[in-house]
């Protein structure tokens, strides 16, 4: 099967590599190819994954049966508008980006007007651990037709129905909790560390929620997700804010999550720290670089 990925970051890179390993013809396109400074690393990544790096978006979309969009939330609609002028009848555009239902519906209108089909896809867990087995929710007028193709590829998809936006709504509402827990942990332990009471706080959390791992790897994992992906998560949470506002639900917590996720990234950038310099990730050491112990 001819498959194209627009966006060759973490999720797109993993899925593209695994699908290529199955014998599919996988092509990738990323706007980093347009920047001289980032092109060599992109070429190396494509070579390592044994996928074809397209010369242009038009080149990437030609002859593709399935087109997966795995860009950032802020670029999701721009990609739709650029791709729509190049898509043809019979092609399926699968939008895996974490954006508001309203954004997905607007994207669907653009793709449908171009004659292609639009599939709303919600990625319901981090991609690295389960890779192709990562749970996906799919919806859209052609979702029932596309599901067998995804099953053939080994993707773990669940059909919701023909309505665009339902899968996205589930993902957006879930993100309030998931990204919120990351932000709460970052803020909580940043302060606790400054007061020298972090172990007592973690002991108390473990006593209240003994099955979650507060006394083990959970704090490292939650804060590492912000350190590594806070920029993208902040953009996604801005879409969550829109999701809530569209149905007149106050988005105070979601707006605060945006600030906390982005805040940690900004603090690391201000100190010229990159996530690769922080691995293996130990939350205490990372926060000490931002907030020197009192």
What residue spans do the PLM features occupy?
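NAD(P)+-binding Rossmann beta1-loop-alpha1 motif at the extreme N-terminus of oxidoreductases
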Residues: 1-62, 87-90
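The conserved SAM/SAH-binding core of class I Rossmann-like methyltransferase domains
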Residues: 6, 29, 69-70, 121
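Hydrophobic beta-strand scaffold residues
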Residues: 26, 53, 117-118, 157, ...
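Rossmann-fold NAD(P) dinucleotide-binding segment
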Residues: 57-118
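Rossmann-fold dinucleotide-binding core
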Residues: 99, 105-179
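Helical "substrate-binding/catalytic lid" subdomain
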Residues: 170-279
